[in-house]
Amino acid sequence: SARQEVAVLPTPVQLTTQSGMFVLKNGLKIGVSDESLLPAAQYLQTILQNAVISTAEVGGQPADIFLKLTDTKGKEGAYKLNVTSGNIVAEAADYSGIISAISTLRQLLPAAIEQSSQDASHSIPAVSIEDAPRLAWRGMMLDASRHFWNKEEVKHVLDMMALYKLNKFHWHLTDDQGWRIEIKQYPLLTAK
C-alpha cells in the first residue's frame, strides 16, 4: 500500500514515514507515566471524542497511546512521537512538549475527525517524529478592540493556536474608549 503523505506544521526537525497505520478503535486506552499528564490525556480524549470512546489512566501500560515524561535531552518543548500499527508513544521532558506531541498527533488525524458523530474508521500514518520549538516566541495577536468577538470565537482562535503550536497570545482588548469584554460588575465599560 502507498504511504500516506504526511503534512505537519510547523515542519518537524525530523519526520520519518514508516509502513503501516495506527487504527483508532473504541475502547482505546491512553496511558500516562505521571499523574501530572492526566490533563493532557483528557485533552487528547476531547480531540478523539468524535471518533472513539477512550479511557485515560496513570501508569496505564500497555496502552494504545502512551504519554511519557522522560529526559529527552532536548530544549523546553521538545518531544518524540512514534506511531506504529500497534501503538503511539509520545515522550517529552516537560508538559509543553507533551502538548506539542498531541498537537502533532491531531494534525496527523484525518480532517473528518473534527466533525461530530463520525462512524467511519480513522487511522493515523505510522511515523517517527522528533521536534522542538525553533523559536521561543510563536504568537498571534487578536485585535478585539474594533469589533466584538464572542467567547466561542475566541476559544476557536485559541484552539487553532494550539493546533499549530503557537505559544503566545496577545489579546488587544481596548483602543481609546472602546472596551470589548463584558464584565457584569462594570456594565458601563461596554455601554458607552
Language model segments and positions:
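Long, contiguous hydrophobic alpha-helical segments, chiefly transmembrane helices and signal peptides
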Residues: W137, L142, L173, Y186-L189
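Acidic, contiguous N-terminal accessory segments
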Residues: S1-R138
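Aromatic- and acidic-residue-enriched carbohydrate-binding clefts of CAZyme catalytic domains
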Residues: Q177-K192
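Single-residue recognition of alpha-helix capping/boundary positions
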Residues: S36-A40, E153, Q185
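Loop/helix-junction capping segments adjacent to catalytic residues or to phosphate/diphosphate-binding pockets
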Residues: L38, I99, F148-K151, R180
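The substrate-binding groove and active-site-proximal loops of carbohydrate-active enzymes
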Residues: A92, R138-K151, K192
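A conserved hydrophobic secondary-structure block that centers on an alpha-helix together
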Residues: D143-D176, I183
